[in-house]
Amino acid sequence: RNYYLKKQNTILNAFQTSSINNKIEIYNETTGVHFLMKIKSEKAEKDIINNAFSKGIKLSPLSQYYKNNEENNNIYVMNYSSLDSEKIELIVEKLKQCI
């Protein structure tokens, strides 16, 4: 449990101190090994997902769980359970390039 709490703190801190902090909102950061992240971007959700995938990042859009998904565009379920803590800064930097 402490292992994942430390990992969570590391990833949240990486996002909060990065230059994309003003382009994201993080929700439910106290719920296990995942949180929700809204990306404030003019880019379409599909484009962000494809750009991230091309950089080795798999994003899970919240919209896939809703019938009327327009309200939930660019909100992603961020699961960090298998994430290598040493690569968090690199992942944030790659994600920055996608949005």
Roles of regions detected by a PLM:
Residues 54, 69-99:
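PLP-dependent enzyme catalytic core of the Aspartate aminotransferase-like
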Residues 37-41, 80-82:
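Short beta-strand-to-loop capping motifs
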Residues 4-12, 24-38:
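Conserved glycine-rich beta-strand-loop-beta hairpin in the small C-terminal domain of fold type I
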Residues 23-24, 63-67:
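Short, solvent-exposed loop/turn elements at beta->coil junctions and helix N-caps
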Residues 42-49, 85-90:
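Short, conserved charged micro-motifs
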